[in-house]
């Protein structure tokens, strides 16, 4: 039995020496003894690979590459102890939650923290640390006794709490479970009797230091194995000289002395150490720059070198540019220096901000990559299935969990069917027991409250298919819901969950997905699918083992399960042999690489800022160390350990070292380089730092950007854009373009790039024949449709030509409220007519009663009872009642002060309507039929002549200007007035003249006041706020029929009358001749718009008038992609002109017709 050290600085050949000796033993070994190569967990694959690929080595059956944990499994399988169920971190946390609940009243320090979420996690970590450092509850009690002289000591009370909880945990685990944190203690106990270790030769490599548990195992090895070889990285000078705590080699020198003392205590013979390396370590014989960094980085005073080759310093615009640059460098190394992918590693201090970027960008560059990190599985379909299935029940079949469940692709329903089902559910607000009440869905979207509810054959067939999909979609989750309803404890719920997974054949689906991914070459994804099922089942088993008989409701069970799923991570080994490995400095173990790219060398990242973690502060750790309770190093020691990580980063590769840092983060905030960068500059002053942008510069471009065809193509597109813009571009991009054009596989991509360069974001007109096919030679149109066309022809094409529309959702929107008020006001007019009541004589009480009845009648009809669906919507009914009441009170005041009375309410014109359609002849034998519905037509008689006042209800605060009519933006009022006058004989048996066209705002406004206000004053203020807007006939007698109390400015109408009978200048009045002129212009404008439609005008041409833009509320922005910065995307500017100019334009447009 002997111990031998293999010592040397980085790159001196320690690992090579270990491997060579193992190979030599394998060549000589005839089975007399086993050979164990003990390395860190993450390095086992690399060492196995290096042994397995040794030329002329016939086999390695007598050699095993193991980590401490794998050695423990091997020995416990041999000696007993491996069969007992083990409990992992999640199980311990669940047990500790229960213990904390039971003991919270007895805790001195943790009694408040015990209730906080996450405390069980911190406690579990603290107890694991105690076990790793071989501190038993008895040692904690001794520590408490040492501190008895310090009354009220927080550390003493903390130890007391930990001792109590530690004891409870051990009592719970005893005889039931094996704690993985105890594996190495068990290994140390069983190891002396193990034939695996007895007489074996053990090589230990790759460690900086060991935990007390690991020291305990090594202690037993020294007394059991034949020979133990330990490779440690430090300068051989420290074999004879003391090492200061501030030295970066201190951790490994401390390890050396600990093992030396251990061997002395055990009286194990020491073999002479093997000292590796010469003046220049073997690894760096070919690269003096890296060798200089290895030797002098931590030495003072500074010793600069004129060496430069082999080390690169790179500053990049941001992290994306940094990873892009790293990808280009890797391709260059493989292409120009003939390295293999496996010869290159990428290392970082922290992968958090880089992992996704590296995965995406390296794949874009065609670089095979393996990122050495535990993979979170929260977004895996299986995990999402489990979480959403439970949430479906806990959230009572809410929309979100139901469709997360259905979109996992683990349900026997096609995704297209799920999408159709989702559209239907969103449109009709289906949730809760409407999913599983066994009644077919027959809900339909109604666009008016009086719509016929009969379902045609096509709709019936679609609903039948939808219900088939629905029943198939909920079959398994419905059964699961019924089972869970009868479950009383954790075991029963978990059993029901497992049966759900079985019924869905999830295990078979995972296997099929794994095979599919493997065939497609997605090896990482294949391994994830292959591992996830077993890991989830193990998690369910552990939950049952730890809490099986505990009674939890489903919400509490879900919390426990989610905690387990969040901690579930997959550890994968590299799926291929030749690939770039990416890892952190702490985990990365690649002993034989030629090039290392160290990314993210920013201030505060490398070295990392120390952070106090766990239940013990640095001060408390030091205090415990003084009484013999040694815990893990605190933040201060970790800061010194960071120096060793810097050393490993700089010495990882043998020939190429590429150091980079980002100058800004993802939000553009500046980042400073690490002091490491400055130190390297000082040691190697001849190295020129490169500053790399996100994209290549136009002139003097770096050829490294032309490294990968797919990425070069995107850069080429940028360069061609610069050329088109008239800027000079490096001629090399012409060569790049020529290369792409000559490659058959890239010709289509080149075509798209060129098309994009000269892309004009504009649509050419449809051929007239296509326009007629699309809209018909007999164009049926509404005024709102024509106004949409005037707003933007392309918007009209999308909505009425292609019939695009927003996804229908079960929510109360402005159109729904408009629909409600139109129906309510119609019903009110019909109700008072049936009761023979006059609008002008209605009392407030009558108004309140009738409006209340109407709201109660209509509320259930709106959108499948949406107003009854939630408390918020039920409150809205009260608001709607108030608004309707206010509208009727205002209209009644109009009637009281005037003579105009309704002659038609909600009257339609068009096919199958009360009034005929308006027929307009267009060119090329086309016709346009105008159809619509008029809210209200009032009539009064003056001097034997009937006059019509046209009223349109709006929910906002609308107004109309002459410019709106001239530009065709607001034609509805004028069109409806024209229809009313056109068919006046059918309404009042004689022709009528226009009196007004007005907007009436249906709303319940607030009254602003700076002081007390009487009810009469408030009513007057409300009338002013609800004053109608529009145009009236400039005839005082006719206007007096609308407001007989008019004196000065009217509070009902947009008009004011002076004492001399003249109108105020702000009065919105026009003459009878002007009304006639507007009606003639209307016909001209309608025909003009209709002709543009059928002619195929679909131009992207939104209007802009001042700050008002057509695109502001357009739902088609993502389709048209209108961009004012593009040369061909210009707003159609509409100028604000004086009314005199506008009347001239109208006359000019009509020519002789206005005479």
From Swiss-Prot:
Gene3D superfamilies to which the protein is assigned, alphabetical: 3.90.320.10, 6.10.140.1030, P-loop containing nucleotide triphosphate hydrolases (3.40.50.300)
Keyword annotations of the record: 4Fe-4S, ATP-binding, DNA damage, DNA repair, DNA-binding, Exonuclease, Helicase, Hydrolase, Iron, Iron-sulfur, Metal-binding, Nuclease, Nucleotide-binding
Enzyme class of the recorded protein, top EC level: hydrolase
Cofactor: Mg(2+); [4Fe-4S] cluster
Secreted is among the record's keywords: no
UvrD-like helicase C-terminal domain boundaries: 280-590
Any one GO biological process: double-strand break repair via homologous recombination
All residue ranges annotated as the UvrD-like helicase ATP-binding domain in the record: 1-300
Binding site for ATP: 8-15
Binding site for [4Fe-4S] cluster: 792, 1111, 1114, 1120
One function term, GO molecular function aspect: 4 iron, 4 sulfur cluster binding
InterPro entries linked: ADDB_N, DNA_helicase_suAddB, DNA_helicase_UvrD-like_C, P-loop_NTPase, PDDEXK-like_dom_sf, PDDEXK_AddAB-type
Cofactor: binding comment: Binds 1 [4Fe-4S] cluster.
Known EC number: 3.1.-.-
Superkingdom, taxonomy of origin: Bacteria
Additional comment: Despite having conserved helicase domains, this subunit does not have helicase activity.
Assembly description: Heterodimer of AddA and AddB.
Family, per entry: Belongs to the helicase family. AddB/RexB type 1 subfamily.
Function: The heterodimer acts as both an ATP-dependent DNA helicase and an ATP-dependent, dual-direction single-stranded exonuclease. Recognizes the chi site generating a DNA molecule suitable for the initiation of homologous recombination. The AddB subunit has 5' -> 3' nuclease activity but not helicase activity.
Protein name, per record: ATP-dependent helicase/deoxyribonuclease subunit B
Species of the source: Desulforamulus reducens (strain ATCC BAA-1160 / DSM 100696 / MI-1)
């Amino acid at each position: 039995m002997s111990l031998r050290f293999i010592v040397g600085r980085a790159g001196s050949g320690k690992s090579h020496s270990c491997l060579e000796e193992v190979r030599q033993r394998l060549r000589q070994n005839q089975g007399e003894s086993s050979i164990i190569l003990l390395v860190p967990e993450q390095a086992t694959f690399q060492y196995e690979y290096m042994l397995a690929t040794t030329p002329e080595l016939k086999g390695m059956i007598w050699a095993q590459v193991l980590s401490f944990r794998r050695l423990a499994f091997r020995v416990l399988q041999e000696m007993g102890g491996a069969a007992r169920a083990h409990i992992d971190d999640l199980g311990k946390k669940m047990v500790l939650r229960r213990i904390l609940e039971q003991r919270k009243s007895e805790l001195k320090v943790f009694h408040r923290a015990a209730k906080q979420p996450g405390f069980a996690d911190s406690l579990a970590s603290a107890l694991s640390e105690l076990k790793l450092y071989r501190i038993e509850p008895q040692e904690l009690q001794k520590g408490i006794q040492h501190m008895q002289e310090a009354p009220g000591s927080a550390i003493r009370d903390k130890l007391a709490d930990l001792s109590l909880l530690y004891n409870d945990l051990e009592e719970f685990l005893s005889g039931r479970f094996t704690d993985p944190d105890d594996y190495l203690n068990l290994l140390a106990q069983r190891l002396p009797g193990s034939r695996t270790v007895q007489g074996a030769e053990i090589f230990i490599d790759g460690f900086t230091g060991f935990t007390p548990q690991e020291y305990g195992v090594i202690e037993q090895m020294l007394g059991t194995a034949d020979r133990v070889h330990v490779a440690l990285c430090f300068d051989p000078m420290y074999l004879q000289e003391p090492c200061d705590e501030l030295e970066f080699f201190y951790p490994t020198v401390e390890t050396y002395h600990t093992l030396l003392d251990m061997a002395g205590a055990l009286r194990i013979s020491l073999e002479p150490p093997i000292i590796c390396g010469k003046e220049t370590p073997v690894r760096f014989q070919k690269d003096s720059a890296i060798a200089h960094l290895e030797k002098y980085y931590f030495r003072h005073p500074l010793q600069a070198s004129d060496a430069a080759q082999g080390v690169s310093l790179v500053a990049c615009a941001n992290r994306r540019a940094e990873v892009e640059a790293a990808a280009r460098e890797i391709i260059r190394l493989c292409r120009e220096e003939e390295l293999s992918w496996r010869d290159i590693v990428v290392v970082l201090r922290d992968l958090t901000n880089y992992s996704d970027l590296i995965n995406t960008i390296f794949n874009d560059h065609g670089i095979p990559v393996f990122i050495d990190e535990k993979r979170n599985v929260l977004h895996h379909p299986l995990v999402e299935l489990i979480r959403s299935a439970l949430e479906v029940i806990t959230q009572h079949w809410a929309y979100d969990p139901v469709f997360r469940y259905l979109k996992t692709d683990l349900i026997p329903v096609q995704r297209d069917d799920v999408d159709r089902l989702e559209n239907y559910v969103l449109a009709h607000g289906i949730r809760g027991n409407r999913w599983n009440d066994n009644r077919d869905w027959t809900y339909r979207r109604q666009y008016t409250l009086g719509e016929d509810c009969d379902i045609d054959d096509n709709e019936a067939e679609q609903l039948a298919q939808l219900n088939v999909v629905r029943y198939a979609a909920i079959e398994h989750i419905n059964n699961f819901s019924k089972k869970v309803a009868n479950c009383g404890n954790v075991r029963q719920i978990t059993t029901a969950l497992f049966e759900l997974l079985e019924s869905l054949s999830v295990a078979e689906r995972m296997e099929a997905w794994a095979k599919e991914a493997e065939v497609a070459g997605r090896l990482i994804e294949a391994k994830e699918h292959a591992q996830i099922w077993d890991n989830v089942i193990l998690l369910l088993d552990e939950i049952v083992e730890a809490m099986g008989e505990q009674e939890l409701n489903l919400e509490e069970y879900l919390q426990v399960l989610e905690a387990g799923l969040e901690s579930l991570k997959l550890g994968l080994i590299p799926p291929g042999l030749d690939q770039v490995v990416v890892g952190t400095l702490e985990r990365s173990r690649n002993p034989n690489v030629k090039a290392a790219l160290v990314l993210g060398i920013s201030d505060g990242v490398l070295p990392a800022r120390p952070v106090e973690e766990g239940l013990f502060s640095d001060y408390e750790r030091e205090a415990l160390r003084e009484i013999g309770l040694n815990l893990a190093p605190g933040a201060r020691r970790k800061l010194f350990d960071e120096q060793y990580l810097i050393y490993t980063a700089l010495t990882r590769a043998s020939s190429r070292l590429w150091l980079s840092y980002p100058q800004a983060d993802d939000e553009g905030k500046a980042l400073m380089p690490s002091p490491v960068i400055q130190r390297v500059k000082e040691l190697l002053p001849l190295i020129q730092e490169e500053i790399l942008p996100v994209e290549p510069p136009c002139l003097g471009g770096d050829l490294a950007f032309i490294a990968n065809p797919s990425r070069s193509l995107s850069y080429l597109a940028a360069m061609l854009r610069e050329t088109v813009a008239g800027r000079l571009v490096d001629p090399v991009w012409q060569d790049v373009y020529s290369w792409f054009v000559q490659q058959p596989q890239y010709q289509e991509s080149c075509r798209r790039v060129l098309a994009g360069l000269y892309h004009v974001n504009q649509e050419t007109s449809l051929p007239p024949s296509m326009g007629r096919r699309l809209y018909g030679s007999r164009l049926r149109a509404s005024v709102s449709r024509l106004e949409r066309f005037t707003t933007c022809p392309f918007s009209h094409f999308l909505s009425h030509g292609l019939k695009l529309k927003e996804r229908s959702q079960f929510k109360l929107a402005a159109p729904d409220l408009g629909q409600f008020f139109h129906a309510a006001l119609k019903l009110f007019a019909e109700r008072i007519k049936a009761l023979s009541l006059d609008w002008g004589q209605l009392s407030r009480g009558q108004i309140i009663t009738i409006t209340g009845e109407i709201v109660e009648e209509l509320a259930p009809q709106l959108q499948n009872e949406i107003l009854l669906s939630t408390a918020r919507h039920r409150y809205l009914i009260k608001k709607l009642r108030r608004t309707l009441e206010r509208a009727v009170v205002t209209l009644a005041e109009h009637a009281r002060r005037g003579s105009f009375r309704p002659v038609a309410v909600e009257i339609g014109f068009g096919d199958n309507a009360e009034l005929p359609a308006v027929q307009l002849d267009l060119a090329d034998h086309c016709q346009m039929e105008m159809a619509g519905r008029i809210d209200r037509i009032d009539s009064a008689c003056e001097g034997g002549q009937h006059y019509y006042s046209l009223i349109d209800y709006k929910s906002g605060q609308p107004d109309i200007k002459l410019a709106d009519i001239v530009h065709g933006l607001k034609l509805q009022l004028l069109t409806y007035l024209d229809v009313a006058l056109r068919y006046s004989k059918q309404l009042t048996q004689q022709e009528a003249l226009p009196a007004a066209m007005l907007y009436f705002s249906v709303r319940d406004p607030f009254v602003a006041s700076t002081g007390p206000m009487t009810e009469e004053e408030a009513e007057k203020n409300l009338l002013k706020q609800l004053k109608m807007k529009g145009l009236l006939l400039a005839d005082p007698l006719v206007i007096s029929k609308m407001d007989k109390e008019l004196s000065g400015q009217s509070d009902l109408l947009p008009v004011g009358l002076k004492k001399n009978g003249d109108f105020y200048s702000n009065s919105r009045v026009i003459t009878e001749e002007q009304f006639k002129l507007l009606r003639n212009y209307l016909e001209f404008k309608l025909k003009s718009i209709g002709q543009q439609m059928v002619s195929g005008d679909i131009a992207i041409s939104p209007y802009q008038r001042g700050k008002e833009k057509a695109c502001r509320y357009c739902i088609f922005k993502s389709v048209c992609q209108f961009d004012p910065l593009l040369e061909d995307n210009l707003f159609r500017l509409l100028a604000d002109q004086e009314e005199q100019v506008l009347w001239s334009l109208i006359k000019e447009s009509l020519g002789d017709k206005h005479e």
